[in-house]
Amino acid sequence: MTNIRKSHPLIKIINHSFIDLPTPSNISAWWNFGSLLGICLILQILTGLFLAMHYTPDTMTAFSSVAHICRDVNYGWIIRYLHANGASMFFICLFIHVGRGIYYGSYTFLETWNIGVILLFTLMATAFMGYVLPWGQMSFWGATVITNLLSAIPYIGTNLVEWIWGGFSVDKATLTRFFAFHFILPFIIMALAITHLLFLHETGSNNPSGIPSNMDKIPFHPYYTIKDILGILLLILALLALVLFSPDILGDPDNYTPANPLSTPPHIKPEWYFLFAYAILRSIPNKLGGVLALVLSILTLLIIPFLHTSKQRSMMFRPLSQCMFWLLVADLLTLTWIGGQPVEHPFIIIGQLASILYFTLILVLMPLAGIIENNLLKW
């Protein structure tokens, strides 16, 4: 008799994806972050669902409904902080996952990589809209400043902004539609994530050496399921430590003040995971130029596969490219720091230099390092 997991139409799909999946025998802990992102997504959908049961998307009551969740709803405070800090964990895993893809040359799986970049964009949009929902000062002004960037688009910009706002300023209509989109987008993300996996399983996973591993594969279960469970436990431990000891450390104190259109906060800044892009935006004095740089800072990921010049796929045996990669990581950390600083000397010039370095590394220095390494190895 055939095993049910191999014959049942539905269970068969799960079996081929998570149980009998042939997996390279040498993938390291850097490959754990895909499953961690899946766990983060499930956690965000579940906590978000329970928050949506008590939240009211109305300018008059949104702020107090969040306070009500924290004070009056059973375990509402932990649900709210799991959701808020879960987003931070999501982005930490996401940045590591993308970094892994760049380091080990996983971007050569074009479809998987492109869907991943679309996923990144969708996630950023979802997180931005979620930040607006508590309707604190930073929520309101963040929404105003970021949506206003679209007015830099020639000819249609102003109309586009007013269309998104649903009026002449960020108001009730904006909050309602942001809540609607924030609710629906995670399900779209889930569909995209399944497509991402579908394309990945067409080619099979990459591995640290970047060499095809078809002759040396092992079943996903039990070897990698147990490894993933360890990663999940560590993620939950880190998240709970954050939620139970310092839940507000990554937030902005200004968001505990109800939104007031008549009073601008001294420093408007987004959540920490957008600060690198925000720093790039601010480093260009021209509005349209800044918006273009902001969009290109993420869109450059789409052209990375076409800038791969090395004869080797992975950076595992390429010390020069490794230096460039870690310089890029340091540069992104610098940009994140600059994004949270006021616009004054010396932060302006540091931000501009870091922004130039970011694009130079991706578009010029990393491809150049690949060419130099090929020549050194006489390939």
UniProtKB/Swiss-Prot annotation:
It comes from the Eukaryota. One of its GO terms (cellular component) is mitochondrial inner membrane. The keyword Membrane applies. Its cofactor is heme b. One of its GO terms (biological process) is mitochondrial electron transport, ubiquinol to cytochrome c. It is found in: Mitochondrion inner membrane. Heme b b562 binds at residues 83, 182. Component of the ubiquinol-cytochrome c reductase complex (complex III or cytochrome b-c1 complex) that is part of the mitochondrial respiratory chain. The b-c1 complex mediates electron transfer from ubiquinol to cytochrome c. Contributes to the generation of a proton gradient across the mitochondrial membrane that is then used for ATP synthesis. This is Cytochrome b. It comes from Ceratotherium simum. The lineage of its organism: Eukaryota, Metazoa, Chordata, Craniata, Vertebrata. The gene is MT-CYB.
